[in-house]
């Protein structure tokens, strides 16, 4: 709320009275500072008349956030700092000097800083000037990537990009041959870091190194085009072949096992059926011990035994007559 009022106050002060003869000067239009260093932003002002109750204000416009922030305000001997810049700003105290020094500068502090001086007693004049501040930072480790299919006859390109780096890094690609780096300049854009390879057959496979650099230093990343081109395909092919071979072997073993089980089951069924048939035939043949004695027992006097035919003859009327005749003949002979 208070910073917003500070932004409105200069407008109200201008409407209440005219500012005349206030001239703000910024001798340096651009300031470069290393990360963690201190940035001194020079700003002086002059007036043809006494300023009276004037005030000084510094504003910061972040290009990254696209927002304007009030970071410093001075009026009637009191100074204030705000936001991320609180306790980081030291202001000049001599008359006519509105310079400030900002400590521990970070990449997020890169942007435009505006010095403003207002006096309600004077007419309108040149009351503000801006300075660009660049917080220099070494390129971060680049991200390297291959786009496209790394096979013969295919279009591919190598990417190299840093997330941070100020000034903006420039990129260079090199072919790595043991300890020797050979620059690669064909179809290469040093600003974007993209290396185009129109046909892999015209390019020697191997290791490639990207170097991103600026005045603060450099960072590198590498790509192994050989392993991605050959070893990767070989490993993938071998893996697929091994899987297919395992599937085929398992299928063959399963089929053979199923056939063997089916054959064994059929053989067992035939043996059981043969055994049952044999037992049935054996059960139909009468046993001598179980055969009923239907023949006439022989006389005690003669102790004669009936013949097998007589014993086996069934008891019919004809057989009964034959038995009677035999009995009579036997009785006559005994007399």
Swiss-Prot record:
The chain crosses the membrane at residues 234-254. Disulfide bonds join 43-115, 160-210. Residues 22-136 form the Ig-like V-type domain. Expressed in thymocytes. Residues 268-306 have a biased composition (Polar residues). It is a single-pass type I membrane protein. It comes from the Eukaryota. The keyword Repeat applies. Residues 139-226 form the Ig-like C2-type domain. Residues 1-21 form the signal peptide. Residues 319-335 have a biased composition (Basic and acidic residues). Its main location: membrane. One of its GO terms (biological process) is epithelial cell morphogenesis. InterPro entries: Ig-like_dom (IPR007110), Ig-like_dom_sf (IPR036179), Ig-like_fold (IPR013783), Ig_sub (IPR003599), Ig_sub2 (IPR003598), Ig_V-set (IPR013106), VSIG1 (IPR029861). Residues 266-335 are annotated as: Disordered. Residues 22-233 are extracellular. It holds the Pfam family Ig_3. It is found in: Membrane. This is V-set and immunoglobulin domain-containing protein 1. It comes from Gallus gallus (Chicken).
């Amino acid at each position: 709320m208070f910073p917003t009022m500070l932004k409105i106050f200069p407008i109200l002060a201008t409407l209440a009275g005219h500012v005349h003869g206030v001239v703000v000067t910024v001798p340096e239009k651009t300031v470069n500072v290393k990360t963690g260093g201190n940035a001194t932003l020079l700003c002086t002002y002059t007036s043809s008349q006494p300023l009276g109750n004037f005030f000084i204000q510094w504003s910061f416009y972040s290009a990254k956030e696209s927002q304007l922030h009030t970071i410093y305000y001075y009026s009637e001997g009191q100074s204030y700092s705000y936001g991320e810049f609180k306790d980081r700003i030291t202001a000049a105290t001599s008359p006519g000097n509105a310079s400030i020094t900002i400590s521990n500068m970070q990449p997020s502090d890169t942007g435009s800083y505006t010095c403003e001086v207002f006096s309600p007693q004077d007419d309108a004049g040149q009351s503000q000037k801006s300075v660009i501040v660049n917080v220099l930072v070494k390129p971060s480790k680049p991200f390297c990537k291959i786009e496209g299919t790394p096979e013969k006859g295919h279009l591919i390109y190598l990417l190299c990009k840093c997330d941070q780096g100020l000034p903006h890094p420039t990129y260079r690609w090199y072919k790595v041959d043991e300890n020797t780096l050979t620059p690669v300049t064909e179809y290469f854009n040093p600003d974007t870091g993209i290396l185009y390879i129109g046909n892999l057959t015209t390019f020697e496979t191997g290791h490639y190194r990207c170097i991103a650099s600026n005045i603060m230093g450099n960072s590198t990343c590498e790509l192994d085009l050989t392993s991605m081109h050959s070893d990767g395909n070989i490993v993938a092919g071998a893996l697929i072949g091994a899987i297919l071979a395992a599937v085929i072997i398992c299928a063959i073993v399963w089929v053979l096992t199923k056939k063997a089980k089916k054959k064994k089951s059929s053989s067992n069924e035939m043996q059981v059926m043969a055994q049952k048939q044999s037992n049935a035939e054996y059960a139909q043949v009468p046993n001598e011990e179980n055969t009923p004695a239907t023949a006439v027992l022989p006389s005690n006097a003669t102790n004669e035994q009936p013949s097998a035919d007589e014993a086996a003859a069934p008891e019919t009327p004809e057989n009964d007559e034959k038995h009677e005749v035999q009995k009579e003949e036997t009785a006559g002979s005994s007399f």
